[in-house]
């Protein structure tokens, strides 16, 4: 980084810019005299909007350009929605800070119906997520699920134009964009288990950049980091990309870590669920052991079908 200037690589969507501004304000508050600049970029994920993410490389499309900017020195850090962060990082880069988590639940958004269960048969629900799709299809196989891409504003416009009867979005994104009023009802984890890391903001940087890592340290929220560590360890063992039907949600209750997870067939015909409880310091192992349980109870076959025969070992 330059003397007293830190540069954040960010996508240009309203939500990405909110996250970058949030980190900028936190850093400048923690370190008077530090100037934080945004380096807005367009990623492939922002350009390819006419195809479901699962068919064009998953959500890693949203981070590759940001990582290149850090590797070639145009930026010092990148700010990500944790649910978009792939399992593996390019050599020399890593996730060093996880900020405090916002509400991780999914949101049911509709101008006509109060809840998913109230929708009549044949209603159209919009989502681009296989995870959401499989859980909705399992609960309401009589609904029609259609792909929905674009930023939050674009998705809401499609709902308002009548293209869909309801759409599913993340509560956290709507809250951050001050669109809380659009949330018809949050979906309990029992109905729609969130994505790995959903609601959390993560910061990636060059691992050898000691000064930047020191500046970022005060932004780390340990409880969130522990919860996300368990969720990501499970996802890593499942070899889950960001566009596979995997849900995972960890909570800390009375000093104990409670991790729930599922792997589902995209059409909702089969869902394998499991849970584990343990000590927070064992978060990573908890995630791995739960993944092993899921794999042994049918998740391996489901994922092999999703990956067209190339599932986890």
From Swiss-Prot:
InterPro entries: HemC, Porphobilin_deaminase_cofac_BS, Porphobilin_deaminase_N, Porphobilinogen_deaminase_C, Porphobilinogen_deaminase_C_sf. Transmembrane segments: none annotated. It comes from the Bacteria. The keyword Cytoplasm does not apply. It is an enzyme of class 2 (transferase). Monomer. This is Porphobilinogen deaminase. It comes from Cronobacter sakazakii (strain ATCC BAA-894). The lineage of its organism: Bacteria, Pseudomonadati, Pseudomonadota, Gammaproteobacteria, Enterobacterales. The gene is hemC.
